[in-house]
Amino acid sequence: MSQPFKEAMFYTPIENKGVVCNLCRHRCKILEGRLGTCGVRYNKGGKLLTLVYEKIIAAHVDPIEKKPLFHVCPGSSSFSVATVGCNFHCDFCQNADISQVKIKASPESEPSPEQIPGEQLSVEQVVEIAEQHHCKSIAYTYTEPTIFYEYAYEAGKLAHRHNILNVFVTNGYLTAEALKEIKPYLDAANVDLKGFNADFYRKKIGAKLEEVLDSLKLMKSLGIWIEVTTLIVPGWNDKEDDLRKVAHFIYAELGEDTPWHISRFFPHYKMMDVEPTPVHIIRKAREIGLETGLRYVYTGNLPGDEGEHTYCYHCNKILIRRYGYTILENHIKEGKCEFCGAVIDGIGLN
């Protein structure tokens, strides 16, 4: 049986029963009877409700490498969950069937719990399932964890009491106040930095690049372990100059120890007419990252590529040999390179 909708966190009442949602950096002004840009936060009579609390559309046990998080408990499993909805509207979204779900709502037609796609999965159940499958972490992923923040926040608190880590796979559009509130329970995040082109962010995503950069810097200052992913879309964010700007930002603002995952685009959603990213561009981007001084630069969606492996930044030997999400060798012992003793950056590198 569906539960009543839960009151949302982070909003401010305004005139005429309107509200301003302060969860993400859009800071939507939501009139009575309307939804935010994420499509899952509804203003009912001046009270902001989350429509997706404990309503899960996807739940799987994944290798942590799939997030991708290569420096968080390598080889472990992560119980991964999502609700419908997203505060971005990327033309190239690979999960558009669940992220871009349209929920009907108006002042005359209030949404009902039965309308919301997904199955009821309580906070207690998500932690219990993670334990049953010996998962070292719970990943809030697939769509955008920001828009099911209340669920992630409550599950995250409980997970920590059971010695389970919490990780976000996020577009990095949380407000500073939302990030600071969840910081005690958020151990790591893979953040999509979709390029360094403000025009690309505005036209193809509907967001502001500068806001994402501010979030990344704040996460770093809060002590959250960060890995960055850039999906390279031909003709949009594949220029060498833009890639150098991404690499330099990571190096200068997040640190040389921040992993950068460079991912190959395949046609999807509203960009079916765009060709897959040429492999040489992915490899060139990795080269740029290494030249900039980043220690760990990875190629994504290229199974078998040498860029899948983790190399020691000191002796250059392969520390973790991968094929796709599978670990074939691991030469990190007690957080150090087995060959030269260099300290390798990350969480749970045993």
Predicted regions and their residues:
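N-terminal [4Fe-4S]-dependent radical SAM core
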Residues: 1-21, 25-83, 96-100, 308, ...
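Auxiliary Fe-S-binding modules of radical SAM enzymes
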Residues: 1-32, 235-350
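Core alpha-helical elements of the protein kinase catalytic domain
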Residues: 22, 84, 88-91, 157, ...
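A generic "binding-loop/recognition-motif" signal
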Residues: 34, 86, 197
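Extended interfacial segments that mediate partner engagement and assembly in macromolecular machines
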Residues: 46-153
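Hydrophobic packing within well-folded, soluble alpha/beta domains
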Residues: 90-93, 168, 228, 337
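Conserved AdoMet/S-adenosylmethionine-binding subsite of the radical SAM
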Residues: 118-280
